[in-house]
Structure formats: structure tokens, C-alpha cells
Amino acid sequence: MHNNENVSGISAYLLGLIIGDGGLYKLKYKGNRSEYRVVITQKSENLIKQHIAPLMQFLIDELNVKSKIQIVKGDTRYELRVSSKKLYYYFANMLERIRLFNMREQIAFIKGLYVAEGDKTLKRLRIWNKNKALLEIVSRWLNNLGVRNTIHLDDHRHGVYVLNISLRDRIKFVHTILSSHLNPLPPERAGGYT
């Protein structure tokens, strides 16, 4: 990981988005060809184009990645793609060392995961994911920040776990995670918190 705090924070934030609403894909083609692809999907064109793409471009420039960002419109979602072996392994290696993230990286990752998988209603603050072990890591980080939470299997979503922020600690979550100066959320994704 680079020493630059902006690079590590933005990288952790983007990794949260990738894990929540995207993926790291190694695609195999005929003729023994392969493609390494980093993907983030979102319903909001504005979020992809005005917020996520500039952050990804910053990281691409910092890492001297030669690949270009592609934004593909699907039926219901927009997909940001970068075909790059270097960027693929950069994020894959980050994911392997997630337990070693410093506090800044933890906050940035949680913020990205929340933008991707979080419930933005005023009644509850929740993050969904199929990977219970990942949510347990996030839960520990939040507990260390003084934000109480619980994890359980969501009965309405088969095989998906939900991390619930305690009612008492919603404001602390908003101030600690969502209002951090790193990568401020666009108003449309802040659930009324800006």
C-alpha cells in the first residue's frame, strides 16, 4: 500500500463499493486469453459518473494504470469497469489484508460498503452482505469506534446477513463514518444526512 493517505483512504472506500456492489473478475476467453476486471455497479448514473469515476480515475493515475474507465448502461444499473490486471491484484491484495486496515482505511471501507449495501432510511441504519465473516470484521471496527451493532440472518433475503446499527448509536455512525471528510457522500446517497 502506498504511504499517501489519500490513496489508501480512497482505495479502501472503492474496495467497500466493489465488495458491496461489484466485484473483481478474472475472465477466461477462447485462445487462452484472459481479462482482469474491476467492477462497481450502481442504479444512479450521477453517483457513478460524478462521484465514483473521478475517485477511480485518481487511483488509476496514482498507480500508473494505463487502462481506461468504461461506464456501461444496463437495463436497471450502471456499471463502471476497468480492465486491468494491475488494478485487479491491487484490490485483491487489499482485500487479503483487510484485517490490518488502519482506522482511516476502516472508516473509508465501511463508508463505501454502506453506500453500496446500506439502508438509507431514517428509521434504521443497516448494511447487508452475504459474507458474514466480512460483516463481523466491520462489526468489530464499529464497536472499536463506539458504535454498537448486531448481525443476524435477514429472514426476507435468502442467505444475506444484515448488520444493524443500534438506535442509540445512529448519530455516532453518521458523524464517524458518513460525515468523515474522506469522500463525502453525494446528497442523493446520504439518506438525508449531509
From Swiss-Prot:
Biological-process GO terms, alphabetical: intein-mediated protein splicing; intron homing
Reported cofactor(s): a divalent metal cation
Domain DOD-type homing endonuclease: start-end pairs: 14-147
EC number(s) from the headed UniProt entry: 3.1.-.-
Pfam families: LAGLIDADG_3
Class in the EC hierarchy, top level: hydrolase
GO molecular function: endonuclease activity
PROSITE patterns reported in the protein's UniProt record: INTEIN_ENDONUCLEASE
Annotated cofactor note: Mn(2+), Co(2+) and Mg(2+) enable equal cleavage, Zn(2+) is less active and Ni(2+) is essentially inactive.
Keyword terms, alphabetized: Endonuclease, Hydrolase, Intron homing, Magnesium, Nuclease
Superkingdom of the source species: Archaea
Function in brief: Endonuclease involved in intron homing. Has a slow turnover rate, cuts the coding strand with a slight preference over the non-coding strand.
Protein name in UniProt: Homing endonuclease I-DmoI
Organism of origin: Desulfurococcus mucosus
UniProt lineage: Archaea, Thermoproteota, Thermoprotei, Desulfurococcales, Desulfurococcaceae
